[in-house]
Amino acid sequence: MNNEKNFLSYMVFILVCLVVMICYSSGIITNISEKIEESSTLAVNANYKSNNLIDDMEKNSEKIIETIKSFNGEKAVSYYITNEIDDKVVYLTFDDGPSVNTRKILDILKKYDIKATFFVVGKEDDESIELYKEIINNGHTIGNHSYSHDYKYIYTSLENYSEDFLRLQRLLKEKCNYDIEIARFPGGSNNTVSDRYHKDIMVDLSKYLIESNVTYFDWNVDSTDANATTMSVDNIIREAIKGAKQFNSPIILMHDAPPKTTTVYALPCVIETLKKDGYEFRALSPDEYVIQFLRAKY
């Protein structure tokens, strides 16, 4: 009798254990099912969002007639292109001069028998006037980079910008008998610093230059020499060459302000490497290849 009771107790214990295990397993299965369903939902949502993003990009791209993209790290930038060319041509551009570095750059350009573009600021000392003249006499192009290069002043109003812009135009005309036909906005036409002083002013300033028959230029290659007061020579060489080789016609942003000594040291290597790669060098012209981040619409 005792054996029967013991057997029944044992069987009850086994049944209880089985029930507990089944319930526990059901919970796990349910949880796994929920996780799978959740993952599937996330995947569907991600695919939906991705498709919507592609649709949005396609819709947006229709608003830009001709664009190219440059990838600098994780940043993608769109450009408007005018007069695209098939030749392999490099356009070296130097902003913020003249300075002691400008003459050194002019000597290098003369050595390699190539032309470039200098987006200058306003300086009226004798040495700077001579440098303006030397740029012109050596067959390079001068562009207007604003007289003051004072973001707060020129980007506060159209009146301030135009006054500053025309001051430099007059200086070059009076001292060098030179008519400036091209320009580059400090920070580029898509700069966001200007919004601190006047929201969306770049549209008005772009229209102003167009109405003044002045072509403004941006760039599609950044040498990164402005990313530090004095960037390393190796970094300038690497970024300039790497960026240039992405394009048939790279417009390279460089600087010849007083601290940019390493730009001078990097320049020969950049020139020699791109020459070996089959590029020729030209100065910018309003009638030739133009790249703009922002294009004003009427």
Q: Model-flagged regions — what are they?
A:
Residues C17-I28:
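Hydrophobic alpha-helical membrane-insertion segments, chiefly the h-region
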Residues M1-L15:
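N-terminal Sec-pathway targeting helices
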Residues L53-D56, Y79-E84, Y112-E124, A183-V193, ...:
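Short charge-dense sequence patches
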Residues H149-L253, A257-K275, Y279-E280, P286-D287, ...:
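Catalytic domains of cell-wall/extracellular-matrix polysaccharide-remodeling enzymes
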Residues G27-D87:
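N-terminal, intrinsically disordered, polar/charged segments of Gram-positive cell-envelope systems
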Residues N60-N160, R167-D179, T273, Y289:
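Active-site beta->alpha N-cap acidic-glycine motif
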